[in-house]
């Protein structure tokens, strides 16, 4: 595949690319300290090149106190020592480019660490030169300060938080600072204070650090929660839902009043005049389809594609850890809506997994020994045949599964621990709460990459920061590479199909059998070629409806996951791609 884009709407390079996300802490450890590092990634690049991916997305490797595993950054222009040095990074970047791949950095600029020099200076007092780089507000004296709504992180605070917003990580979104007797805003952890993008000095500082990395040779950015950077300056109270302690502030910070202005400014100040090889991806929780069209319209100069979360919230009940069964019709409605909605303008990221999601084969498939391989490859086929740029999260190509967490002491993730503490304090059954964490907790994605059957899965010679899944004895890269029928080789075939079949990249999307609760079916049509994708989302054989079966019975099979076929009946978890020319 050619590396240089040509800029035409249907010919930009990233539309036919496949991205592989690396979570450095858990990918490969070169020095035996139990934590993955840059040298470990460099040593495994041939594996990724053989897989066929085009872009590596590197989760944060900047210096960080690691309160949120690197998404709390204390220095944007260096490398976290446990991952290596800038020299190690430069070697990794050169080795990636030598293999014809690109490297995209994770950019986290909605917030910094509270240990970043910017925030330390801001915290010095109301007269600090950087006070307005963050969202500081005085306490409210006219609100009841008893109970959790006053801010559980600061029970001795003299007044209530400036508004009632809740944090994504449980509790209040405000932290009291005793030194100035004011509160600062943190939509995530108290150690992740939100930057004030209303201040042009903040924006200029962000532009400068982005240019610094691009000048170093990186190929773009995945922008973390980038649609949260614009807040309503009035910071109004959010609506309370049910008996909730905290208000929903999202209408005042999700896709806020100046977010398009800020992204267009980044495009002008950072990317203008640079080669078209660069990629910008915006992670956007809560983004609507209509908003995504604006963000990804090439004529507006904002981002190339978005990460949206609609389809990975379909098995949520009252909240993320209240797990309910997936209804296939809901999944089809969601993915189909985004396919048709971005058909004329815009572009989408295709993903099942990332560092925040549980393993897809455990979530929407069957991770038991009988059906794990077939359900993992079925899910991969469905995703990769949609229109958009596919993302593979490390280990997904092996069919890695959720991990067995026996007790709350086995859980490391700050989000899960915060939810557990709040839920148990509110009187919920601890065992039931833990069941929700087992199903949807972020630690499921963060167990070490399973390289081989040796101790600690070949990830480290030391003690891993998070234990390897015990099933690495059978589910690992060495075994998968050696087995032509493995999940790994199915991913290789899917990637090769995207690189060689224009209908996969550019074809129109048409959903079929929208109300069928067992079969997922759609076509991709480009010029004289039509592809039919059929997938069985159950553990039982399912016949293709007669009309569709008759129309496609003689169409050649392009790709499948269940061996030879002789009839239009899909075996458990089977997927097929047929071609009409």
Per-region residue spans from a language model:
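Active-site and adjacent substrate-binding regions of carbohydrate-active enzymes
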Residues: 2-581
């Amino acid at each position: 595949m050619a590396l240089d884009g040509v800029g035409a709407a249907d010919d930009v390079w990233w539309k036919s690319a496949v991205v592989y996300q690396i979570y450095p802490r858990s990918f490969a450890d070169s020095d035996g300290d139990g934590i993955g590092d840059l040298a470990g990634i460099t040593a495994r690049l041939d594996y990724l090149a053989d897989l066929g991916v085009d872009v590596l997305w590197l989760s944060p490797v900047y210096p960080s106190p690691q309160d949120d595993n690197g998404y709390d950054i204390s220095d944007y222009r260096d490398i976290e020592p446990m991952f290596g040095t800038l020299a190690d990074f430069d070697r990794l970047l050169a080795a990636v480019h030598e293999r014809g791949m690109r490297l995209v950095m994770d950019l986290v600029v909605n917030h910094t660490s509270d240990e970043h020099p910017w925030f330390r200076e801001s915290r010095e007092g109301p007269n600090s030169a950087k006070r307005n780089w963050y969202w500081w507000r005085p306490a409210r004296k006219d609100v009841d300060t008893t109970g959790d709504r006053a801010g559980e992180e600061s029970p001795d605070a003299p007044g209530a938080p400036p508004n009632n917003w809740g944090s994504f990580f449980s509790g209040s979104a405000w932290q009291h600072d005793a030194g100035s007797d004011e509160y600062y805003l943190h939509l995530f952890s108290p150690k992740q204070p939100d930057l004030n993008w209303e201040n042009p000095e903040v924006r200029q500082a962000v532009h400068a650090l982005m240019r610094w990395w691009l000048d170093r040779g990186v190929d773009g950015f995945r922008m973390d929660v980038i649609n949260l950077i614009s807040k309503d300056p009035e910071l109004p109270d959010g609506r309370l839902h049910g008996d909730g302690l905290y208000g929903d502030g999202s209408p005042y910070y999700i896709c806020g009043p100046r977010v398009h202005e800020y992204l267009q400014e980044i495009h002008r100040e950072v990317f203008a005049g640079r080669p078209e090889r660069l990629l910008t991806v915006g992670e956007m929780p809560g983004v609507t389809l209509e908003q995504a069209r604006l963000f990804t319209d090439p004529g507006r100069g904002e981002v190339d594609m978005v990460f949206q979360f609609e389809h990975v919230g379909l098995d949520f009940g009252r909240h993320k850890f209240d797990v309910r069964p997936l209804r296939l019709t809901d999944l089809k409605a969601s993915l189909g809506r985004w396919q048709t909605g971005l058909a004329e303008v815009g572009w989408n990221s295709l993903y099942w997994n990332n560092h925040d999601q549980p393993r897809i084969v455990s979530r929407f498939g069957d991770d038991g020994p009988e059906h794990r391989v077939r359900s993992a490859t079925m899910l991969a086929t469905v995703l990769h045949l949609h229109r958009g740029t596919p993302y593979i999260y490390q280990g997904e190509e092996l069919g890695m599964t959720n991990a067995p967490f026996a007790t709350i002491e086995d859980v490391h993730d700050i989000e899960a621990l915060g939810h557990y503490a709040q839920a148990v304090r509110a009187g919920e059954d601890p065992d039931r709460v833990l069941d929700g964490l087992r199903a949807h907790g972020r630690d499921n994605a963060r167990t070490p990459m399973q390289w081989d059957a040796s101790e600690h899965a070949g990830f480290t010679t030391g003690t891993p920061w998070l234990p390897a899944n015990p099933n690495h004895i059978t589910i690992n890269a060495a075994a998968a590479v050696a087995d032509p029928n493995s999940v790994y080789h199915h991913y290789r075939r899917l990637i090769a199909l995207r690189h060689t079949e224009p209908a996969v990249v550019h074809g129109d999307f048409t959903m079929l059998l929208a109300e069928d609760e067992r079969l997922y079916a759609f076509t991709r049509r480009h010029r004289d070629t039509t592809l039919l994708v059929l997938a069985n989302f159950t553990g039982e054989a399912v016949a293709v409806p007669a009309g569709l079966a008759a129309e496609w019975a003689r169409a050649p099979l392009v790709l499948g996951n269940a061996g030879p076929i002789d009839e239009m009946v899909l075996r458990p978890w089977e997927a097929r791609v047929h071609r009409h020319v």
